[in-house]
């Protein structure tokens, strides 16, 4: 009895830390950074914003002007020692992580922008930048994910979809009157059981693009901007892994508006993951 009493006292003094299960949080940021962070004018500001998020994995699109060496150096500014970029030139996508990255495939052939398939933290990441109307790009990637999911692997598809979600339809009809609605990419992904993490946790988050940085080059004024705003940037997780998610949203921070025309997607999962 004395031994049990001492255990109870010790547990209370330690805040029960020795007896409680520790739950880790895993954080992902996905962001289209507008021609390499506003045509490379806002690289430092973009890196600083990412650093403040303290994410475990960062997926980026439109890394124009960056190559593998430079991208790895840039990733170190937000505390990531590991980075992979799709290609040199054009509109590359990339992935950074605070754990080692295994590059499984860099696919450019037959794609408009291409995609990057990497594994880090025990998760398969497909970083995409779909081209409007090329729906078979999604089919190709989904064919790649099918055997992974059958084996019980964790899979995330994330990036700029250049398409919409039917879950946003009411918002789109009422607000994005200057946009055409195209649900095909998202329909295909959801038909395979993938879960839209932002909609799961923050169904009111309907805007990921454009920001006021598009004025006046691509947008006349704020009035027109409001009629163009919609959500085309997504993080999808396979059904099983999605059960571990505990938050998902889109940051509309004012500082983003001098860095990119897209707003970043931020999602978090519970539980310790594999290295």
Predicted regions, residues:
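Intrinsically disordered, low-complexity serine/threonine-rich segments
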Residues: 15, 19-20, 74
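Active-site surface patch of divalent metal-dependent phosphodiester/phosphate bond hydrolases
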Residues: 38-108
């Amino acid at each position: 009895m004395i031994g049990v009493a001492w255990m109870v006292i010790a547990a209370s003094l330690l805040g029960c830390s020795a007896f409680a299960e520790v739950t880790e949080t895993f954080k992902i940021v996905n962001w289209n950074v507008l021609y390499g962070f506003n045509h490379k004018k806002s690289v430092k500001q973009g890196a600083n914003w990412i650093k403040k998020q303290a994410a475990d994995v960062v997926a980026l699109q439109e890394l124009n002007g960056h190559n593998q060496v430079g991208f790895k150096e840039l990733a170190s500014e937000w505390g990531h020692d590991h980075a992979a970029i799709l290609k040199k030139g054009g509109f590359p996508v990339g992935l950074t992580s605070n754990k080692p990255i295994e590059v499984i495939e860099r696919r450019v052939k037959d794609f408009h922008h291409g995609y990057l398939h990497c594994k880090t933290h025990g998760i398969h990441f497909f970083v995409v930048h779909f081209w409007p109307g090329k729906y078979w790009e999604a089919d190709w990637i989904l064919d790649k994910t099918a055997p992974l999911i059958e084996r019980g692997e964790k899979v995330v598809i994330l990036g700029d979809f250049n398409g919409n979600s039917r879950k946003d339809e009411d918002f789109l009809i009422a607000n994005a009157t200057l946009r055409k609605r195209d649900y095909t990419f998202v329909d295909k992904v959801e038909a395979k059981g993938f879960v839209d993490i932002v909609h799961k946790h923050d169904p009111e988050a309907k805007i990921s693009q454009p920001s006021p940085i598009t004025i006046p080059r691509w947008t006349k004024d704020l009035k027109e901007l409001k009629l163009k705003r919609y959500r085309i940037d997504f993080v999808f997780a396979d059904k099983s892994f999605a059960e571990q998610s505990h938050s998902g949203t889109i940051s509309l921070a004012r500082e983003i508006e001098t860095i990119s025309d897209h707003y970043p997607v931020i999602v978090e999962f519970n539980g310790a993951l594999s290295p």
